[in-house]
UniProtKB/Swiss-Prot annotation:
Protein name, per record: Aspartate 1-decarboxylase
Gene Ontology CC: cytosol
Gene3D superfamilies the UniProt entry points to: 2.40.40.20
Gene expressing this chain: panD
Species this protein is from: Yersinia enterocolitica serotype O:8 / biotype 1B (strain NCTC 13174 / 8081)
EC number(s) reported in the record: 4.1.1.11
Entry-linked SUPFAM superfamilies: ADC-like
Amino acid sequence: MIRTMLQGKLHRVKVTQADLHYEGSCAIDQDFLEAAGILEYEAIDIYNVDNGQRFSTYAIAAERGSRIISVNGAAARCACVGDKLIICSYVQMSDADARLHHPKVAYFEGENQLQRKAKAVPVQVA
């Protein structure tokens, strides 16, 4: 059996730019891509915390250290500057590998300051 697992996650990054006329994609600070193990041109899913929109695109690199999160092309209609996003990439693997797998999660606050990195999503409690 093949399972699709969370590979990398940027949690609560803030949109710094939305460019409807750029050819597509989501530009992400290279430091952020590395923190979550997301490659340039990799498929990503984006979840907009502010408006509930969920959409797919691909990652491109933005200048390292710029803290840029730019939603481009048609996807720019799904996010506004200042919106908080969760950006995820996924990987397919065998059931056996999935049971040993740990995603790369990067948590952000404020103006896209990386707060911490983790290899799991915390257990939700009541």
